[in-house]
Amino acid sequence: MKSTLKISALVLAFAGLTLGAKAQTSTTSTTKTSTSSNGVILSIGVDAGIPTGKLSDSYNFNIGGSVQADIPVAQNLFVTVNAGYNSIQGKNDLRFVTPGGVITADATNIQLLPVKAGLKYFVVPHFYVQGEAGAAFALNKSDVGFDKSAAFVYAPQVGYQFPIGGKNFIDAGVRYEASTKFNSNIDDSKVNFFGLRVAYAFGL
């Protein structure tokens, strides 16, 4: 329930920012946006998220960073390439029932290196939808009990670019990111979360 409330607050806050920015943007503005850019857009961002499903039983949140390149292929359409780092933060003092009784332990942080590619399309100026897929590589698989070094990952996303002058933007996006199993025998070894990325973007 707490995770659902946090996710709802995150989505509502993002929607408020988007609508506020859109209201302040004049329809006669001549500011150049990335939707009409002829060059590559690079962005460097901070990522945060809230685990969902069984992952939320043992993990509080995730934090990390990423770099992304947006390569124009048509009007309003970009190919994206993204690489980053995610640390899924484990909860402390978890209780487990064993044959010898109840024990407490801390969940080990999951460290992932996701690499994704996809498409980004601007529906209207500044507002976009994006879809990416790729692989997430576990950097500490033995510490967290994974038997796979990588898993397939996909991430649908919506976002808004806030112009800050010239070819520079603040790019904010909300996504749902999900993976296949990191452990072949454990259905609950998927890493799924709702995420927020806030990045500084600039045109080359």
Regions found by a protein language model. Name each.
Residues N38-L42, Y59-I63, N109-L113, V144, ...:
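Residues that define the transmembrane beta-barrel architecture of outer-membrane proteins
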